[in-house]
């Protein structure tokens, strides 16, 4: 960098260096150099002069005319060597500070001379000679002296020159502090040159500075004068001040040399090897401001070429200079560099070195570039940025530049749009038009125009229009061919102006527009008229109501606004009172009529409200409007169903099976399709509570409508949007209703191919379906997806059930409806609000209340099937209204249905959520119900909380029944309650008027049959009706409630009202639901076993009523007794259900075990009964667990589960507030529940256990509605418990939506039980027998759940009527390997299709399973081999495989919960262990996930290894295993810990057990595992590893495990619920399911089988994935869909290899499903499979996989 020429000899070099410098430097920056030189020389002169004035470090004293002058020998030597030689010749040179006289010179004259010497930038030779002459004249011997003087001067000069050469020698000798480069540096002035000579000569140096081992000899005086750093260091008391040699750190010798040259000579150049940036730092550190200026100058000169037009070689150096300036803080240089870069940003940004610029500087470049935008350069910068984007290669180092260019382009477009009128006139815009005209695509112009369209506002529209007009008139636009583009934008602007005329005319720019334009716009705007109203009228027309699909779509937006209208619409058939509740879409036509008739007030608005509600979920659900909407919806739904009965084309096959079925199915499908997409877990979460609360009202109507299954579809249509809100609940309800309906129509059920048969297998199956739908509703979005699959079967089942009989038909119809319209629950909710609004409707509803429980169940179901939440809700809503209609026609039937309401825990859970709302809402319209509810709530807040999900719906429904029914007779309600309780399913068939009577009769018959057959629905309804006396029957009732979605939902809602007023469903929707479920179960158990019931009830109450202590049990009982009066059956149902739950689960988990508890209690009081329950009650148990499963996922249960802290599940102290609040469970689901519950029987612990998903949550149940929604969106599992008598007891859905019904109960209880079991021995101390029974029940329940899910799926399968839920995974899990083999084999041959749970549903299932294990236990116990076989057969019918999988999933969940509860109850919980190990084969995935956890627990449970216990253990182990992942791993302790499910035990135990339970386990487990895996997958895609581990290595083997793992890996885990983590298999399955369901949603509507198959396939996938421990790279949706499709096809082709004798059947069924992984590559999105082999029904509906993410 030395620009001085190469200096020759040092002596010559120095003098010539200035010339050399001038010669080398005169460049383009000469002016800057001159300025810098002047500054530096002046500074040097000033510094040296300061030495003289301050007399720093002087070493010589001159006496002049009596005056003393202190000077520096070195300076005098450098500046005036002759004078120095003259005065020192007379003295000894060695002395310092010697007084030297100067004669013949005046002091003033000498002083002036010294100043010149020290400061002059010019040579002082003349002054020196002058002073010497004066001195010599005064000398005595002037000549001689003169000669000597000159001699001395010459000598001195020579010496100086000679000394100057010495440094050369020294330099050559190794002192490298002086180099030739340094010698070449040019001094700034003569003073600098003289001082530099002094430095180089090293004369009179008095200090050595060591840097990098090199010594620099210097003079203290000059260093101090030039540097503040040295001045401070060399003066004062510093050690360096007295040292001869000092060492400097942090500086290199090159930098030191540059610094010394500048100090002495003020050099303006640096050596080439110097680091300018580092020198800048040195200058700052040593206080050399001049050196800093020189460094900046060098940077500008050498790096930036003084910022003249950059050339390629300078671009990189300018960037380097920019970085240096930024690091050192040279703002001026930084600004100069930045300005240069801004001017040529495209060149600089494309430099590779730009990638090395710090990101903050890059951002500054971008921001400054954006700031530089102006009217003139905006278009230019837009083009430049586009060139940059198109020209840069797509490599790593260009990422930053590309990103910046894209941002800049966007800013340019924004700027141009904002200033379009000015930019348009600029030359750069003309260039832009030219370049775009020459471009193949005028993309930049298109971007500008699109941005203009997007940014049109009232303020800028006028100015934009004027600018476009100007542009259109310009020649350039016409020449370049952009007239069309510009005109298109102008037309849009014109349209906007016309539409927004009233807003635009007030803007300033409007005044600037041309008058002609103003007049034209005004004329066009004023001629609008009432077009919009006209547009709405068709939507409100009755004719449009029949357009279910289109209406759903149309009304959806309105539905949000007109939820009430939507809800009322489904009830059209009953009356137009529900009209106000505008149908979502299916019931829109009927709803319109009804709305127009009954609630003319804003039909459209109501419809909009419903739609909004569906969309917003919680928004509209929590309100009286919803309550009103529900009854209306039911009525409209009924009417619409009837009107649509001929119209429904949703499932022609199923329609063929049963007109009603078709109606419900068609509507459900349409609604599903229309609304399922809209239904979201979040929406559901919020609305589910509302629905749950509103559901009681709706339930009441549902009861009324329970008679006609057709009502479900109508309700769906009417409540399309509501359906979305309550879709989870509704879908589940519908499904549950469908199941119950199937049961009710046990003889009729076969009318519907799959669903009917599924439901037919028994009320248990129906219950399972119902509970499961609840779980599904809870699933939320995933549930929706899964329920799309499930919905088909559900709807079919519903239709079949309708055909089957009033009782079963209704229930089936409800499931179908729920399945089809994810908004069944919403419909119910809508109907309920409407009921509130329209007391007459309530009266009708009261008549229909028997059906209303079904509706609630349906709601629960829809909540359960969040995947089909919208559709299911729609279906349920429609069903509810239809039920209402039927109810109007058949008050008796409705009353009968009222019983089923309490009967269905799932429904109750779901309805409970809605019931909470409805209770609140209903309380306003009618105090009768409220009073009964009030008594219930206060008495058993905790129980209410537990039951809140399940029973709350019942209570509220009951309340609604009371309120709505008072006009009718309470006797009727009681009768309804009794009848429905006996056969909650009849409620669903009731929606049809004809079937209504039949249904009623059937319900009564079911009631009889229920007691006789022990059918879940009948038995449960009857048991509940019968009274607490049938404690185990009530347990089944609870299941029945869940199972009989519509009826049970309503009953469940009413049940809390009647059975558990203290339980206060309304208050603690989530917690209370769980608690209510528990207390109900406990009651059932108590009634079953007298001595068990009291404690159980207490536990239930305590669990359900954190605020209500154990004493509350009395209240609960009294409340139940009170309820008995008007709702004897309901009361029994609720009580029995609740006590059952509480009794068994008390120690386990009052709330979580609600379903399980029901089962457990049932099982405990009579193991025989539970054995039966295992077969018949397996569904129920599953249903109950499913209801619990739903709990975590359902809104309410979700709340409970999400905040599944111990208190959360059992119930919250705020139970009463829950009554009031739509989602008070959100408020109190946590601590209060846990505290009281745990006190009583560890119920509060149950609460924690219940929230395996929420193990980490605070006891105050901190899960937010969002979390609840997530859960709700998750898989909804219906747990069905079979009564000992064979009745299926829909325990609970494990969905939040079902929470009001008791859904949280099973989940909460079972899950809560586990944590509480850990925490409290009481739960664990529940009798082993009971626990074993419960375990069996739980396992059976799991199977039932799956069967139930399968039921939903197999609604289309006629053969799957009753067996389905019983058969489920539960059968496999709880029956002996051989026993289950034969049964499962038939089931396998039937190829039961589990409902394909959506991811959310799967998550919910996982969550529910985690919590529902306890419920599964009862199911296991009650499930007898025959029951299990029956369930299996039922599942075989069409849903068998899938249902089983689902059930088993639920069972696993329930089992998991139960196992947890059992951990406390070690005997029972661990009874599952042996079977669990067996079951792993069957439910290996579930077991593997849960079993790994659970296998650890099983040792405890194995204390009582009963065969059925084993079944239960197996099943529970599956469920538990799944749950164990998050819940049961450590038994109770883990139950309370969220990480539980993370502790997946390796499936070694599973592997050992697989062979025995393989057939059965695989069947049930795959069904269960699939949902659970799906659940886990949906919820915890992150846990894939766990999923792999959890997935059984043996069962569905590696393929399934792999699939599971793949799904699991693909799906991100939902941190929200530990259950997701817990149920790895479920997560995987859920993930698969989610993908499948999303893809399958549309097809699911039409194909329940497809849904079931999907679920089964997903399970297989999950299991295969887990077994393979391979993370498949299946795309979450498409690949899974393809995989599942292929697997389905493969299954259709051949039953696959059995894994063992026990696995043979299971494997036949499952191997059919296990090949999807193999054929996953096949990219068929839609697969048409018709195979009698695969399908027990011999019917494979088209498996349409609509891969939606």
From Swiss-Prot:
Key words, A-Z: Cell projection, Cytoplasmic vesicle, Endocytosis, Repeat, Synapse
GO CC aspect terms: axon; cell body; clathrin-coated vesicle; extrinsic component of synaptic vesicle membrane; neuron projection terminus; nucleoplasm; nucleus; synaptic vesicle
Record has Hydrolase as a keyword: no
Family annotation (InterPro entries): BACK_BTBD8, BTB/POZ_dom, BTBD8_BTB_POZ_1, BTBD8_C, SKP1/BTB/POZ_sf
Expression tissues: Neuron-specific protein. Expressed in brain (at protein level).
Biased composition, class Low complexity, residue ranges: 11-20, 607-616, 1208-1217, 1418-1427
Region entry Disordered, spans: 1-36, 526-638, 658-680, 697-749, 771-1034, 1060-1095, 1108-1387, 1402-1434, 1453-1591, 1628-1647
Subunit description: Interacts (via N-terminus) with adapter protein complex AP-2 subunits alpha (AP2A1) and beta (AP2B1).
Name of this chain's protein: BTB/POZ domain-containing protein 8
Organism of origin: Rattus norvegicus
Taxonomic lineage from the root: Eukaryota, Metazoa, Chordata, Craniata, Vertebrata
Name of the gene encoding the protein in the UniProt record: Btbd8
């Amino acid at each position: 960098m030395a620009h001085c020429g190469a200096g020759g000899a040092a002596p010559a070099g120095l003098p010539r260096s200035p010339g050399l410098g001038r010669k080398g430097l005169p460049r383009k920056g000469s002016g800057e150099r001159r300025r810098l030189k002047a500054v530096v020389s002046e500074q040097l002169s000033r510094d040296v002069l300061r030495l003289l004035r301050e007399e720093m470090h002087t070493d010589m004293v001159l006496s002049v005319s009596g005056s003393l002058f202190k000077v520096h020998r070195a300076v005098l030597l450098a500046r005036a060597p002759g004078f120095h030689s003259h005065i020192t010749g007379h003295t000894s040179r060695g002395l310092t500070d010697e007084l030297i006289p100067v004669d013949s010179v005046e002091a003033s004259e000498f002083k002036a001379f010294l100043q010149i010497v020290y400061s002059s930038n010019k040579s002082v030779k003349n002054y020196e000679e002058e002073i010497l002459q004066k001195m010599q004249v005064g000398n005595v011997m002037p000549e001689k002296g003169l000669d000597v003087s000159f001699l001395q001067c010459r000598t001195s000069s020579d010496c100086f020159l000679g000394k100057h050469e010495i440094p050369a020698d020294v330099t050559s000798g190794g002192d490298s502090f002086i180099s030739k480069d340094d010698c070449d540096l040019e001094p700034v002035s003569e003073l600098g040159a003289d001082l530099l000579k002094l430095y180089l000569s090293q004369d009179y140096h008095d200090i050595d500075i060591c840097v990098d081992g090199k010594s620099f000899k210097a003079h203290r005086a000059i260093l101090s004068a030039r540097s503040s750093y040295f001045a401070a260091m060399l003066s004062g008391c510093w050690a360096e001040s007295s040292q001869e040699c000092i060492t400097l750190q942090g500086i290199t010798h090159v930098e030191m040399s540059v610094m010394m040259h500048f100090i002495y000579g003020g050099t303006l150049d640096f050596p080439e090897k110097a680091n300018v940036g580092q020198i800048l730092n040195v200058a700052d550190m040593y206080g050399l401001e001049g050196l800093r200026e020189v460094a900046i100058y060098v940077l500008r000169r050498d790096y930036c070429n003084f910022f003249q037009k950059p050339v390629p070689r300078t671009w990189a150096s300018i960037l380097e200079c920019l970085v240096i300036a930024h690091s050192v803080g040279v703002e001026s240089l930084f600004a100069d560099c930045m300005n240069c870069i801004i001017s040529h940003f495209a060149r600089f940004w494309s430099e590779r070195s730009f990638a090395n610029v710090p990101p903050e500087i890059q951002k500054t470049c971008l921001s400054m570039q954006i700031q530089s935008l102006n009217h003139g350069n905006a278009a230019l910068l837009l083009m430049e940025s586009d060139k940059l984007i198109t020209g840069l290669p797509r490599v790593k180092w260009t990422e930053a530049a590309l990103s910046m260019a894209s941002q800049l382009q966007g800013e340019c477009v924004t700027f141009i749009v904002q200033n379009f009128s000015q930019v348009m006139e600029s030359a750069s815009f003309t260039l832009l038009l030219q370049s775009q005209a020459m471009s193949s695509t005028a993309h930049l112009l298109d971007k500008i125009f699109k941005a203009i369209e997007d940014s049109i506002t009232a303020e800028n529209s006028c100015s934009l229009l004027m600018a476009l007009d100007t542009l259109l008139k310009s020649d350039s636009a016409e020449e370049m061919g952009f007239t069309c583009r510009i005109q298109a934008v102008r037309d849009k602007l014109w349209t906007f102006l016309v539409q927004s005329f009233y807003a635009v005319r007030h803007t300033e720019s409007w005044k600037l527009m041309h008058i002609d334009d103003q007049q034209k716009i005004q004329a066009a705007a004023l001629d609008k008229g009432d077009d919009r109203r006209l547009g709405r009228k068709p939507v409100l027309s009755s004719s449009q109501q029949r357009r279910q699909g289109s209406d759903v779509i149309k009304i959806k937006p309105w539905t949000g606004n007109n939820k009430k209208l939507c809800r009322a619409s489904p009830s059209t058939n009953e009356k137009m009172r529900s009209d106000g509740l505008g149908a979502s879409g299916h019931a829109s036509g009927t709803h319109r009529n009804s709305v127009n008739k009954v609630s003319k007030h804003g039909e459209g608005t109501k419809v909009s409200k419903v739609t909004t509600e569906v969309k917003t979920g919680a928004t509209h659900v929590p309100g009286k409007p919803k309550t009103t909407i529900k009854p209306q919806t039911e009525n409209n739904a009924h009417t619409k169903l009837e009107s649509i009965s001929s119209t429904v084309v949703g499932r022609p096959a199923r329609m063929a099976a049963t007109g009603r079925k078709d109606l419900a199915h068609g509507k459900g499908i349409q609604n599903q399709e229309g609304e399922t997409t809209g239904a979201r877990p979040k929406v559901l979460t919020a609305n589910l509570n509302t629905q749950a609360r509103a559901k009681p009202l709706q339930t009441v109507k549902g009861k009324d409508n329970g008679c006609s299954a057709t009502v479900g579809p109508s309700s769906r249509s009417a409540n399309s949007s509501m359906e979305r809100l309550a879709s989870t609940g509704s879908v589940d309800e519908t499904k549950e209703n469908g199941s119950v309906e199937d049961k009710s129509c046990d003889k009729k059920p076969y009318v519907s191919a799959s669903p009917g048969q599924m439901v037919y297998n028994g009320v248990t199956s129906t219950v399972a379906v119902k509970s499961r739908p609840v779980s599904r509703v809870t699933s939320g979005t995933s549930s929706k997806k899964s329920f799309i699959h499930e919905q088909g079967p559900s709807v079919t089942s519903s239709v079949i059930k309708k055909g089957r009989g009033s009782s079963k038909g209704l229930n089936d119809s409800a499931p179908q409806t729920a399945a089809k319209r994810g908004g069944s629950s919403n419909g119910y909710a809508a109907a309920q609000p409407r009921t509130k609004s329209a007391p007459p409707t309530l009266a009708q509803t009261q008549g229909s209340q028997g059906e209303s429980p079904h509706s609630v169940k349906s709601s629960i179901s829809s909540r359960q099937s969040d995947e089909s939440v919208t559709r299911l809700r729609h279906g349920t809503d429609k069903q509810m209204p239809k039920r209402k209609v039927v109810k109007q026609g058949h008050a008796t039937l409705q009353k009968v249905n009222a019983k089923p309401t309490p009967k269905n825990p799932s429904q109750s859970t779901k309805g409970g959520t809605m019931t909470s709302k409805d209770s609140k809402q209903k309380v306003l319209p009618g105090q009768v119900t409220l009073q009964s509810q009030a008594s219930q709530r206060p008495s058993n807040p905790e129980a209410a909380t537990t039951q809140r999900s399940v029973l709350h719906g019942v209570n509220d429904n009951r309340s609604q029944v009371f309120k709505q029914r008072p006009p009718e007779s309470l006797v009727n309600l009681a009768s309804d309650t009794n009848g429905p309780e006996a056969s909650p399913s009849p409620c669903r068939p009731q929606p049809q008027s004809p079937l209504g009577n039949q249904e009623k009769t059937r319900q009564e018959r079911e009631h009889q049959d229920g007691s006789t057959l022990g059918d879940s629905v009948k038995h449960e309804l009857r048991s509940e009706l019968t009274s607490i006396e049938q404690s185990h029957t009530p347990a089944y009732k609870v299941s029945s409630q869940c199972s009989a979605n519509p009826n049970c939902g309503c009953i469940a809602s009413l049940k809390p009202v009647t059975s558990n007023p203290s339980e206060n469903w309304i208050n603690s929707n989530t917690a209370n639901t769980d608690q209510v479920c528990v207390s109900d179960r406990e009651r059932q158990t108590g009634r079953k076993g007298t001595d068990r019931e009291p404690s159980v009830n207490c536990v239930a109450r305590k669990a359900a009523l954190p605020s209500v202590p154990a004493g509350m049990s009395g209240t609960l009982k009294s409340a139940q007794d009170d309820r008995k009066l008007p709702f004897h059956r309901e009361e029994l149902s609720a009580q029995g259900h609740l006590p059952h739950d509480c009794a068994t689960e008390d120690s386990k988990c009052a709330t979580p075990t609600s379903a399980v508890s029901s089962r457990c209690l049932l099982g405990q009081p009579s193991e025989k009964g539970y054995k039966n329950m295992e077969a018949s009650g397996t569904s129920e148990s599953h249903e109950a667990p499913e209801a619990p499963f739903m709990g975590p996922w359902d809104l309410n249960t979700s709340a409970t589960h999400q905040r599944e802290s111990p208190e959360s599940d059992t119930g919250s102290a705020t139970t009463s507030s829950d009554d009031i609040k739509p989602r008070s469970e959100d408020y109190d689901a946590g601590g209060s529940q846990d505290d009281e519950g745990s006190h009583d029987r560890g119920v509060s612990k149950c609460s924690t256990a219940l929230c395996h998903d929420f193990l980490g949550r605070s006891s105050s149940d901190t899960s937010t509605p969002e979390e609840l929604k997530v859960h709700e969106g998750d898989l909804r599992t219906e747990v069905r418990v079979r009564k000992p008598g064979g009745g299926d007891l829909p325990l609970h859905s494990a969905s939040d939506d079902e929470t009001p019904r008791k859904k949280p109960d099973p989940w909460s209880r079972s899950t809560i039980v586990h944590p509480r079991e850990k925490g409290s021995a009481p739960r664990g101390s529940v009798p082993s027998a009971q626990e074993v029974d419960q375990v069996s029940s739980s396992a059976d329940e799991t199977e039932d759940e799956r069967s139930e899910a399968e039921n939903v799926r197999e609604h289309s399968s006629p053969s799957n009527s009753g067996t389905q839920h019983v058969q489920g995974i539960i059968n496999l899990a709880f029956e002996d390997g051989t026993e289950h083999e034969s049964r499962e084999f038939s089931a396998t041959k039937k190829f039961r299709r589990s409902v394909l749970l959506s991811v959310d549903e799967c998550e919910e299932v996982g969550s529910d399973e985690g919590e529902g294990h306890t419920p599964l236990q009862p199911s296991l116990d009650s499930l007898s081999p025959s029951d299990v076989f029956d369930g299996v057969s039922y599942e075989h019918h069409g849903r068998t495989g899938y249902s089983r999988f689902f059930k088993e999933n639920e069972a696993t969940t329930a089992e998991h919960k139960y196992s947890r509860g059992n951990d406390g109850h070690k005997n029972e919980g661990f009874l599952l262990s042996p079977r669990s190990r067996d079951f792993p084969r069957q439910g290996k995935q579930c077991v593997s996930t849960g079993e790994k956890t659970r296998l650890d627990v099983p040792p405890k449970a194995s204390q009582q290894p009963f065969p059925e216990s084993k079944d239960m253990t197996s099943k529970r182990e599956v469920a538990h295993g799944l749950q164990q992942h998050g819940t049961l791993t450590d038994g109770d302790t883990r139950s309370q810990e969220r990480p539980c499910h993370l502790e997946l035990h390796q499936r070694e135990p599973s592997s050992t057990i697989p062979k025995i339970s393989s057939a059965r386990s695989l069947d049930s487990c795959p069904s269960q595992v699939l949902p659970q895996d799906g659940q886990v997958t949906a919820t915890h895609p992150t846990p894939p590893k766990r999923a792999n581990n959890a997935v059984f290595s043996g069962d569905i083997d590696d393929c399934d495990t792999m699939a599971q793992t793949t799904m699991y890996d693909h799906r991100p885990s939902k941190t929200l619920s530990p259950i997701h983590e817990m149920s790895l298999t479920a997560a995987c399955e859920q993930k698969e399911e989610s993908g499948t369901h999303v893809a399958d949603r549309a097809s699911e509507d039409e194909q329940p089988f497809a849904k079931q198959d999907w679920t089964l396939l997903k399970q297989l996938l999950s299991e295969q994935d887990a077994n393979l421990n391979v993370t498949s790279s299946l795309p979450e949706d498409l690949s899974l869909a393809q995989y599942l499709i292929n697997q389905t096809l493969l299954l259709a082709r051949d039953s696959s290899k059995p894994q063992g004798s026990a696995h043979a059947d299971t494997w036949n069924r499952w191997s059919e499903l296990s090949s999807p992984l193999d054929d996953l590559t096949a990219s068929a999105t839609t697969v048409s499979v018709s195979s009698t082999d695969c399908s027990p029904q011999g019917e494979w509906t088209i498996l349409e996989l609509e891969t939606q993410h």
